[in-house]
Regions:
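Hydrophobic/aromatic-rich alpha-helical bundle segments in the mid-to-C-terminal region
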Residues: 117, 121, 135-186
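Hydrophobic/aromatic residues within well-ordered alpha-helical segments
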Residues: 46, 53, 57-61, 81, ...
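Amphipathic alpha-helical packing segments from all-alpha helical-bundle domains
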Residues: 94, 100, 106, 113-140, ...
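Helix-turn-helix
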Residues: 6, 10, 14-56
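Helix-loop "lid/cap" segments that line or gate small-molecule binding pockets
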Residues: 86-94, 102-111, 188-192
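Short amphipathic alpha-helical interaction/hinge segments
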Residues: 57, 61-65, 96, 113, ...
Length: 194
């Protein structure tokens, strides 16, 4: 791991635990094992580190989870839909970088406009638009009954978002949260899929 990557890793851990304002550049440098002035060889300052973290997490999420622009292959069956959706949710809930990033975003969404936008996109708008496209594709293939794909996306994603937030607050409930999400997903499929 390069020094630049070590800085990001340390900063993410500290920002997630202490918040952006509760973390000083000296804390980050200390964890990395460098002097604070050496950190400025890699980043202009704490805000530059924060922006690099968000950019990195966005790229990771795009590749591993998808987005409105990158929905992946439209599932061809109920079981494929459940499998792919649970894999995405498992990644979101369990990936340490995404989890820490989410904790940072939740804390800082009221103090930083960019973070507010990213949080809304990942927890509401973007995920709903992504699943609306997937559901619409499955409607077009006759797998999902004809209905409003946007409303179905809300119905599908809202419980998952709430359970992920619960697992972040209460990690000991992660298994229970995943079971609930899968139960809800199977119910959704039973109601809306052929």
């Amino acid at each position: 791991m390069s020094t630049k990557e070590k800085i990001l890793d340390a900063a993410l851990t500290l920002f997630a635990a202490n918040g952006y304002d509760g973390t000083r550049v000296e804390h980050i440098a200390n964890i990395v094992g460098i002097k604070a002035p050496s950190l400025y060889k890699h980043y202009k300052g704490k805000e530059d580190i924060l922006n690099a973290l968000i950019d990195s997490a966005e790229e990771r999420y795009e590749v591993m989870f998808g987005s409105e622009k990158n929905i992946g292959k439209v599932p061809e069956s109920r079981e494929e839909f459940i499998k792919v959706t649970m894999e995405r949710i498992s990644f979101t809930m369990r990936d340490p970088i995404i989890r820490k990033t989410r904790m940072l975003l939740v804390q800082e969404q009221f103090r930083n406009e960019r973070i507010s936008e990213v949080t809304t996109r990942h927890q509401l708008d973007g995920i709903q638009r992504m699943f609306a496209k997937i559901i619409k594709g499955m409607m077009d293939e006759g797998i999902v009954v004809k209905d409003d794909p946007k409303l179905l996306a809300v119905e599908l994603t809202a419980p998952a978002v709430l359970q992920i937030a619960r697992a972040d607050r209460q990690p000991q409930c992660e298994k229970e949260c995943m079971e609930y999400i899968e139960k809800h997903l199977r119910h959704f499929c039973k109601v809306y899929m052929r």
